[in-house]
């Protein structure tokens, strides 16, 4: 068990064996935040850091190809203020991308009580998401504001 603050979370690892071969670790969650969200995960494909924000509620960034110490250094040392913030510091995410050019960074923004409002991919291309008055996904737009997908909700009443 790994301690985080006054909480304890299990160190989670997954192992596999192919045929009669040796067991190998395929997933290892090395570090957690104060609420138990994974912060640093090592898989066969490589290492991934997850940065949470919006007071620990939502994923703000997924950083592939960097260690937690590299991310901490790029973010100015302490990750807690970033994670506790009601909205993430966008300037820190921009600096993170500049400081870790070898990493593949995907970042997310959210509208409270609704959902994801934007996703910025590792190339810096942004997809925007809009919602209707009932908080249903209404439209997905590209980096230039052009509609990529539109959603139309039609309900019918079955008459018996």
Set out the residue ranges of the language-model regions.
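Beta-strand elements of repeat-based all-beta scaffolds
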Residues: 1-121, 126-160
